[in-house]
Amino acid sequence: MSVPVSTQIKQMLISRIDSLTSVQKVYPSSVINNDGWPAVAITPNAEEGEFSSNAENSRVYVFDCMILFPMGQDFVPVEERERTDYAERVIAQVIEDVINAIDTDFELDGGVVLFVNAADVDWQYFDYEGGVARGANVLLKVYTEVTVI
């Protein structure tokens, strides 16, 4: 049985983000634990399809790239001004690194991917077993064409 295209793309994204020095841990699901911060979770969000020709169909695989950093006192250096500000600066750096990593190789090393669209970012707060984390969700849209004949 062949590996689904969505799984192949997810692995490409995980591999690319895992190589960033600003990221401590990448998770293939939304289960986050205390193995390293900032943490990133890559999860499928949606799949979109569109007729392209009699032989090909366009598909868009949408992934959430959730970036989290805890706001607890244990994670903030003493010299920092404030926990929320520090968490937001750490996350902003990871966002920048993720987007730059995708933009510099928007085909994710080729294969099934045509290109990855520019990312939208939504900032949020999250409750997790260790307290509250500041987070940002980077929406990644990966475009492909699939031969149907």
Regions found by a protein language model. Give the residues of each.
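Charged, amphipathic alpha-helical segments and their flanking helix caps
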Residues: 1-34, 46-149
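A short glycine-rich, His/Asp/Glu-containing loop-to-beta-strand
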Residues: 37-42
